[in-house]
Amino acid sequence: MDETVRRMRLDWEIIHAVTSSSGTRYLHENADVYLPREPREIAKDGNDPWQARVNLSVLAPFVKRLISNAAGMVLRRSIQLEGGDPWWEEEFRKDVDGDGTSLDQFAKKRLEVALSYGMSSLIVDAKERKPQNAGDEIDPLRPYFVPVDPWQYLGSRRENDEPGAKLTMFRYQEEIKKPNGDFGEEYVLAARVIIPSAFQLYESDKPEAVSQGPLALDYVPLVNIYAEKEGYLCASPPLADVAYLNIAHYRRLADLLHSLHIAAIGLLVLEDYDGTEGVTGLNYAIRMNPNTKAYWVECDAGSFVAQAELLDRLENEISHLGITKLLGQKFVAESADAKRIDQQQANCVLATAARQLQDAMNEAFRMAGEYRGVEPPKAIISQDFDFYRLLGQDVSVLSDLEEKGQITTELLHKIMFHGEWIPEDVDLKELLANVKKLKEEAKKEMMDQARAAAQVRPAAGSAPAKSASGGNPRRLSVGL
């Protein structure tokens, strides 16, 4: 593992703790780090009070929810593919990784990883489809995207240290599933090395490559998505501060849950009692002397209130440090200017992430087009995160501009699409073709009506028709 990757992992660990799929289980497995043992929590006679506190702890997934909502806002609308071969829209976008993952699902996951660790990557690879029958034509290479998370990075190498130097090697870790016995299976750690025009695969316990082969491209087909770039293949998690607050919330919540668990059971005190019975409960009674006193001792609720207030404060801090406007909403009255400033700040972060993702998708499609040998499409990700719906008067003004020829019909449809007047499942290209056809039919109908009117209209210079009495034509007057 490269030293650069090793250093970045130190910052990634806190993010991995609060965003991993295992969630609370991961913190339980690493409780000595994230929920340290207190001095008096000493295991004795098989009882470990610290382990009891760990077992009651639960992680509130604040950071994970922040990231998921941020990615959802960026990809609120489906990614649009313009131009290129129809194969991209008809087939590829439905399965971009060879396992049935759609383009939108794949892009959302890549963006979530980038917002978590500061960057994410993908490898553009291709496989050859063999003809099913002898007479079938040879199918061109079928490209697909391979997701690579920062936690898989092992290292990279470039030609030199100059800016823009060519990437000559990229190494990352993966798990290979192998059969074990008749019905079982096992996972083996392996390192994949990609160099221009070739790849190699090494298993953890074997010094020689277990698999190797050529690549159709003469460069390393790696595409990176940055959210907090520090350098080439180097980034820092943008939500690290929020992650530390999330861990602080986890610790305080663990203390509160454990305290409530202990304090919920009161302690029975018997004064001047000489008996030996120690069993109490709803089905038991205690025989006491007339001078014996019995009462329950309970904890003061003031300490619990203070812990609950601290938890509320931590939750508010996490909300205010969120990068999305949804999770940063304030449930108090605000001025219009304050709301506008918050909106612009949120849009700035989301727009930057959207542009990074859009550039990465276009670069990936360019590489996939080289594999396929066809023209790649252009991916367009909506930059509108305001949920702003066009008003009726806005649509009327835009329609007037389109009729006067100041904007095109295609632009009008795009504005109405982003303004949520055109449903998302409507094909804009098909809609444009239908509108043009309707306009041509309406124009033709108007021309036909004009010709028909010209045929029945009196010729120019002809005398007006006389009335039946032979005089001038009778005029009708309407009294007002």
Locations of regions flagged by a protein language model:
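Short amphipathic alpha-helical segments
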Residues: W88, D99-A107, A114, D241, ...
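Conserved aromatic-histidine-acidic binding/catalytic patches
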Residues: Q51-N55, L59, R76, R110, ...
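Long, hydrophobic, amphipathic alpha-helical segments used as structural scaffolds
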Residues: A107-L111, A126-K130, L253, L257-A264, ...
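Extended, charged amphipathic alpha-helical segments
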Residues: K206-A338
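C-terminal helix-loop subdomains that flank or include functional centers
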Residues: D274-E277, A306, R313-L480
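Extended, regular secondary-structure scaffolds
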Residues: L115-E228
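Residues in well-ordered beta-strands of folded domains
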Residues: I123, R171-Q173, R287, I380-D386
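Extended, helix-rich architectural segments
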Residues: M1-P143, V148, A454-Q455, A459-L480
